[in-house]
């Protein structure tokens, strides 16, 4: 009987997601890459923490993955470097992240809505749809998405920015999972959201102050979730430091994830279209075809309304909590590594070539930034 309820709930979730995307998304949205062959090697060994047998077998036994598998979740406010992070990890031979699924945060949000409504939650319990049944169904759904939308690998990774708002619940589902929280100066994040016209529920792209307030609320939830999960399970990664010092940061990250070091993570741009696939509708795809460079660090300076600049400390108190100076315009993020400075120079020197590569990976070439001629390194 329990098995039947779990199967019915999984079926409901599948139907819900299919209905959502049929009605809310265009048919040519490439969430899944059908051209890739499956890697049939063994998945990673089970972690130290154990779960009851019926939870371990909630997915097909031949998948090689279960709820104790050491999955990797990358999250953060959109436009905070999550795509760069997943591309660098995708360059590692033992890791596969892939494009945003977009469905995993929605499933987590659906469960959150059920949980918040005492009336709805009680109805589910009375129907025999207990928390355990829901957990098994949602974890099975998440694993099906993670396993099915790309190549198999020893370590599977998911990059959906808003999953980090549910890190505590995800840890309940996947006790051996690791989380990477991408953090970026909120002023840069909001400027990028507005300038690139990234639609996020609740963000008014015509109101910089309101967007800063929304950023502050979102990153506060994510930081609190990360800290609740604990430093052994969740690592905060600052976008600025990843760009300025990629080797030091990636060594820190690979050690945290317990995967061997590989220099390929420093040269992800060489694997685009090979081991790394990009979605032509994601707003960052045209940027991550390029090597790690400094161009995006201070593009926001001079774009913020003066009244918002004056009130920044009160508008976005999380800036100071995260270590940013809300009164610094421009800020001093630090001096870049020599390799990063050279790669930035190459991006400028060969701007036309990188521009051609960028327009090939998007469905709207008009949104791709034109090549930069002036060297911005000296401004940092």
Swiss-Prot record:
The record marks 159, 284 as: Transition state stabilizer. Pfam families: Sulfotransfer_3. It is found in: Golgi apparatus membrane. Keywords: Disulfide bond, Glycoprotein, Golgi apparatus, Membrane, Signal-anchor, Transferase, Transmembrane, Transmembrane helix. One of its GO terms (biological process) is regulation of nematode larval development. Disulfide bonds join 97-157, 226-234. GO terms for cellular component: Golgi apparatus; Golgi membrane; trans-Golgi network. It is a single-pass type II membrane protein. It catalyses: L-tyrosyl-[protein] + 3'-phosphoadenylyl sulfate = O-sulfo-L-tyrosine-[protein] + adenosine 3',5'-bisphosphate + H(+). PANTHER family: PROTEIN-TYROSINE SULFOTRANSFERASE (PTHR12788:SF10), PROTEIN-TYROSINE SULFOTRANSFERASE 2 (PTHR12788). Belongs to the protein sulfotransferase family. This is Protein-tyrosine sulfotransferase A. The lineage of its organism: Eukaryota, Metazoa, Ecdysozoa, Nematoda, Chromadorea. The gene is tpst-1.
């Amino acid at each position: 009987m329990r098995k039947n309820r779990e199967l019915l709930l999984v079926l409901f979730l599948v139907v819900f997601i299919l209905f959502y995307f049929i009605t809310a998304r265009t048919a040519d949205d490439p969430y899944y890459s059908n051209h890739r062959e499956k890697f049939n090697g063994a998945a990673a060994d089970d972690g130290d923490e154990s779960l009851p047998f019926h939870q371990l077998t909630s997915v097909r036994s031949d998948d090689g993955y279960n709820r104790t598998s050491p999955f990797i979740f990358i999250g953060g406010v959109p436009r905070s470097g999550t795509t760069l992070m997943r591309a660098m990890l995708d360059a590692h031979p033992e890791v596969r992240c892939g494009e945003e699924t977009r469905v995993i945060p929605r499933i987590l949000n659906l469960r959150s809505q059920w949980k918040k409504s005492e009336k709805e939650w009680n109805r589910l319990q009375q129907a025999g749809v207990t928390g355990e049944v829901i957990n098994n169904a949602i974890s099975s759904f998440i694993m099906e998405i993670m396993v099915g939308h790309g190549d198999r690998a020893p370590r599977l990774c998911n990059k959906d920015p808003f999953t980090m708002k549910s890190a505590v619940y995800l840890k309940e589902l996947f006790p051996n999972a690791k989380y990477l929280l991408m953090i970026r100066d909120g002023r840069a994040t909001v400027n990028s959201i507005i300038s690139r016209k990234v639609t996020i529920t609740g963000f008014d792209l015509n109101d910089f102050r309101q967007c800063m307030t929304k950023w502050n609320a979102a990153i506060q939830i994510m930081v609190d979730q990360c800290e609740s999960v604990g430093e052994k399970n969740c690592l905060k990664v600052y976008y600025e430091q990843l760009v300025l010092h990629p080797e030091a940061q990636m060594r820190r990250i690979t050690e945290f994830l317990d995967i061997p070091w590989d220099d390929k993570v420093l040269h992800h741009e060489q694997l685009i279209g090979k081991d790394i696939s990009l979605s032509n509708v994601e707003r960052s795809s045209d940027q991550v075809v390029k090597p790690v460079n400094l161009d995006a660090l201070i593009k926001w300076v001079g774009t913020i309304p003066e009244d918002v600049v004056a009130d920044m400390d009160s508008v976005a108190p999380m800036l100071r909590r995260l270590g940013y100076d809300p009164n610094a315009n421009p800020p001093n993020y630090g001096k870049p590594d020599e390799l990063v400075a050279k790669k930035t120079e190459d991006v400028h020197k060969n701007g036309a070539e990188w521009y051609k590569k960028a327009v090939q990976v998007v469905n709207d070439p008009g949104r791709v930034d034109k090549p930069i001629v002036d060297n911005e390194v000296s401004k940092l």
